[in-house]
Structures are given as C-alpha cells and as structure tokens.
Amino acid sequence: MKFEKLGQSGRARRGRLTLEHGVVETPIFMPVGTYGTVKGMLPRDIEDIQAQIILGNTFHLYLRPGLEVIKQHGGLHDFIKWNKPILTDSGGFQVFSLGAMRKIKEEGVTFRSPIDGSKVFLSPEISMEIQHVLNSDIVMIFDECTPYPATHEEAQKSLQLSLRWAKRCKAHHHDELKNKNALFGIIQGGMYEDLRDESLNGLLEIGFDGYAIGGLSVGEPKEEMIKVLDYLPNKMPHDKPRYLMGVGKPEDIVEAVRRGVDMFDCVMPTRNARNGHYFVTDGLVRIRNSKYRHDQGPLDPHCDCYTCKNFTRAYLFHLEKCGEMLASMLGTIHNLRYYQRLTEGMRDALDKGTFDEFVQDFYARRGLEVPPCPVDE
C-alpha cells in the first residue's frame, strides 16, 4: 500500500491510496457491503455511482457462506464480482453488539452464532486468517469496541486488551501469513483524551499502514464525537491514511474532513433509502410526505445519478406508497451517489484551493451556520 498526501487546506487533506486492486482518491466514502453485497445494488450499479472501494464484513462472511466457499472463488473480489479495492472490518464491532451473547477473554471472544445459536470462537489470529482468505486490500485489526458510556477504568482496561490483540494481529498478518495487503490499527479509549493518546501511542509502537478511529457513533452525543475529532486526527501520523469508522451523516463527514480524516463508511445512505429518506444537495427529502404526490421534479436537480436523471419525485412517492422493491433500489442508488458526490466535491475543492467556500456553500444550502473548527497557527 502507498499513501500520498496531495494537498491540504487547514487540517483537511487531499490524498491518494494505491492498493492491490486499484487507486483510491481521498477523502472517500466507502459503501457498506456487509454480506458481500451492497443492499439493493448490482455490482454495475456500484460502479455507476463511481464508488472506488467498498466495505465487507469478516464476522458475517465467516458465518455465511464460510471460508471454504470464498476460498473456492479465490477470494471475495471474484465471489462478489467486484474488481476494485475492498476493506474488511475485523468483526470486533459485531461481537461488541452481541452484548450478553458473548464472552471476552485474553485469547479471544466466544459467542453464540446469531444464525443458528452454535458456539463460535474469534481471535486476533482467526480474524487475520479470515481476511487473508478474503484477500481484503485493507485488513482491520481485531479489537474490542469500547461501549458508551464507559468509566475511565473500563475504557482503559478495554483499550489495553485491544493493544495486546493489535500486537498479535500484526505478528500473524505479517510474520505468519506473509500478507502484503495493508493492515490498519484502530484507536479506542472511549471519550477520554488521555486514553485515546495511550491507545494511539501503543499502536504507533507496533506500527501499522493506516490508523482508524473506533468507538464513535456508538450512541454518544454528537458534541462528544466532535470533541474527539477536535484533537485526535491531528495527533495521528500525517503520512498515513486516517479512517473514521461507522460515521455518518453528511454533516459529520464534512466536519471530520475539516479535522483531517480521509476515509469513511456508514450504513446510513442505504438504510435511510429503504425508509424513504433521501439525501439531497439542500438537505433531506422524506419522500413519503404527501406534498410529493404530484411533484414533477427530479429528486435532486443537482444530481447525476440514474434515479435523478430518469424519475420524478411523484413516481418515487408512488413506489414508496405501494411498498415496491424498486423504491429502495432507486433510493439507494441516489443516496450512495450523493455520498460519492459529496466526497468528490471536497476533493475537487481541495485540489482548487476552494475548500472553505465548499464548506460555506454546504451549510448555506441547509440554512445553517458553519460550525467552528480548530485552526492550527
């Protein structure tokens, strides 16, 4: 993996990632394809919205279809017919979300499969092996996602376990498996700056190809998340990619880019589309609202996606009211293209030196003031 920093405006960065299956321009949003499919999208649709990289999930693919099936296809790329880069989440977050169904020990995590109730064991080594079989371009370490809220003591204990696991992940990925693909560390520590520092410094000692901010978007108020983003990205290596996991709303992504984050993923655009909530240049359209029954305009006049070029809001309203599958499909195409256009717009503005104007326009269209952002002297 190679990461080049191509430009900067304040803390916002313009970069380029070169991976085994292609080049990724940053800032970038990665559509989530948990089970080896982005819900409601054909692989050609994902190409049409100009996604450069997608996300798969180690935990779910390990349970179904299992490694043997994917091995027979020579990896996840051939299995799902996607020839561009793939990042895989290690499974740590999914194990965290199982709650009482899991037991965490030093060796790893034992849990009941949410599919058939059978006992399953996941460890740092097993996670690395699964992701090696998947042939992920970016492999994430197996960690414990610190819950919110957590006391200082709980968050510290959790991050120290994650650091010991991180060391095992690196050893297995590099030394045992000889995997040449990128391996990213994940910073934990809850909402405590001293613990975030401890986690980051521990990961830097081990050494990774990129660094992710974990443990956000887990139920904390937005102010708490912004507080972490005010200080943490700027402490992360300036010559490595920075990834904010599981975030988020368009405003959250803009604010994180302003603070120096490069990569994002979130289920929000796909999930919201299935509920008739569409992201547009001026904010949000809730298509089930009866005011759209006779609306002859496109969903977003500024959008170049298949949905906006071909269908009216009235038609989308009709599909939603009828409970038609096509409503979710067209909505997902649009929402994911919106997120790609958002990050494209930021890249373009960073290239042209007009990033501040981009941010002003983004908020002005929503009738909002630009929030404050830390400035380096």
From Swiss-Prot:
The keyword Lyase does not apply. Residues 246-252, 270-274 are annotated as: RNA binding. Its cofactor is Zn(2+). One of its GO terms (molecular function) is metal ion binding. Binds 1 zinc ion per subunit. Substrate binds at D89, S90, G91, G92, F93, D143, Q188, G215. GO terms for biological process: queuosine biosynthetic process; tRNA wobble guanine modification; tRNA-guanine transglycosylation. Its EC number is 2.4.2.29. GO terms for cellular component: cytosol. The keyword Zinc applies. Gene3D superfamilies: Queuine tRNA-ribosyltransferase-like. Pfam families: TGT (PF01702). It comes from the Bacteria. The active site is at D89, D265. It catalyses: 7-aminomethyl-7-carbaguanine + guanosine(34) in tRNA = 7-aminomethyl-7-carbaguanosine(34) in tRNA + guanine. Zn(2+) binds at C303, C305, C308, H334. Keywords: Glycosyltransferase, Metal-binding, Queuosine biosynthesis, Transferase, tRNA processing, Zinc. Pathway: tRNA modification; tRNA-queuosine biosynthesis. Homodimer. Within each dimer, one monomer is responsible for RNA recognition and catalysis, while the other monomer binds to the replacement base PreQ1. Belongs to the queuine tRNA-ribosyltransferase family. Catalyzes the base-exchange of a guanine (G) residue with the queuine precursor 7-aminomethyl-7-deazaguanine (PreQ1) at position 34 (anticodon wobble position) in tRNAs with GU(N) anticodons (tRNA-Asp, -Asn, -His and -Tyr). Catalysis occurs through a double-displacement mechanism. The nucleophile active site attacks the C1' of nucleotide 34 to detach the guanine base from the RNA, forming a covalent enzyme-RNA intermediate. The proton acceptor active site deprotonates the incoming PreQ1, allowing a nucleophilic attack on the C1' of the ribose to form the product. This is Queuine tRNA-ribosyltransferase. The lineage of its organism: Bacteria, Pseudomonadati, Pseudomonadota, Gammaproteobacteria, Moraxellales. The gene is tgt.
